[in-house]
Amino acid sequence: MRAFFVGRFQPYHLGHHEVVKNVLQKVDELIIGIGSAQESHSLENPFTAGERVLMIDRAVDEIKRELGIDKKVYIIPLEDIYRNSLWVAHVCSMVPPFDVVYTNNPLVYRLFKEAGFKVMHTKMYNRNEYHGTEIRRKMLEGEDWEKYVPESVAEIIKEIDGIKRLRDISGRDF
């Protein structure tokens, strides 16, 4: 069975990590869709699609090693089309076929359900802590953000000078 899981992953954090780990134990293959792939260099979407692919790929490698599995994971950037009624068809045209969707996003749940897909809720993992908006705020404020993302993701953010980028685009003096 092949599953689909979508998010913006700005950045990929430990909440996403736990969902991916949980789903990988239930399915044969997983498609991870990177939503809003065209967005980058903004406060809400500071990282490029390519940077997010790298974050997710390295984090998934950690999961595979930890679980001792070698399942296929596709990581596919998906640009927004701004028409919800057509979004599921757009996704289906961009990714391999899948049997089930995992999401906690109410709109994603509804759109795939209406299109006839089996849709499963995922367990929420410390949603208040593992939330991209809050992690980006911590980055901006110089607070400890690294404990909320996998180690490999923190390394990538440092490699690309992601904190400086976020601070530069915020237009704030530090």
Curated annotation (Swiss-Prot):
InterPro entries: Cyt_trans-like, NMN_Atrans_arc, Rossmann-like_a/b/a_fold
Subcellular location per the Swiss-Prot or TrEMBL entry: Cytoplasm
GO MF assignments: ATP binding; nicotinamide-nucleotide adenylyltransferase activity
Superkingdom classification of source: Archaea
The protein's annotated pathway: Cofactor biosynthesis; NAD(+) biosynthesis; NAD(+) from nicotinamide D-ribonucleotide: step 1/1
Disulfide bonds: none
Gene3D superfamilies: HUPs
A single Gene Ontology CC term: cytoplasm
Gene Ontology biological-process annotations: NAD biosynthetic process
Catalyzed reactions: beta-nicotinamide D-ribonucleotide + ATP + H(+) = diphosphate + NAD(+)
EC number: 2.7.7.1
Keywords of this entry: ATP-binding, Cytoplasm, NAD, Nucleotide-binding, Nucleotidyltransferase, Pyridine nucleotide biosynthesis, Transferase
Alphabetized Pfam families for the sequence: CTP_transf_like
Presence of the UniProt keyword Transport in the record: no
Family according to the record: Belongs to the archaeal NMN adenylyltransferase family.
PANTHER family hit by this protein: BIFUNCTIONAL NMN ADENYLYLTRANSFERASE_NUDIX HYDROLASE (PTHR21342:SF0), PHOSPHOPANTETHEINE ADENYLYLTRANSFERASE (PTHR21342)
Name assigned to this protein: Nicotinamide-nucleotide adenylyltransferase
Phylogenetic lineage: Archaea, Methanobacteriati, Methanobacteriota, Archaeoglobi, Archaeoglobales
